[in-house]
């Protein structure tokens, strides 16, 4: 299952287990955040209703981007200014989309084996 979420003025296509870099979100590394602004969700070619759907993600790290140099110059006026800027980012790992966890598939196989063992 995939979803399109909006955070920090940008849109991201995410699925369970993906890692994305977004604009800075409040929180410590290891904490869980919920991305509630889901624009689209689907499975393969089918689209699902996004009403009340949330995307759960874990904060992996708070980081800074590459340094961007801002250089201003006015020729023939001996005017030069050099400033640097590093944008703050948050690295997220998507845990689940709409309550559907990635780990739910493994217990389903265990439940299927249990009735087979009971019949034998």
Curated annotation (Swiss-Prot):
Record-level GO cellular component terms: cytoplasm; ribonucleoprotein complex; ribosome
Disulfide linkage: none
One MF annotation (Gene Ontology) recorded for this entry: structural constituent of ribosome
Keywords: Ribonucleoprotein, Ribosomal protein, RNA-binding, rRNA-binding
Annotated GO biological process: translation
PANTHER family reported in the protein's UniProt record: 50S RIBOSOMAL PROTEIN L21, LARGE RIBOSOMAL SUBUNIT PROTEIN BL21M
Binding partners and assembly: Part of the 50S ribosomal subunit. Contacts protein L20.
Function comment: This protein binds to 23S rRNA in the presence of protein L20.
Entry similarity comment: Belongs to the bacterial ribosomal protein bL21 family.
The protein's name: Large ribosomal subunit protein bL21
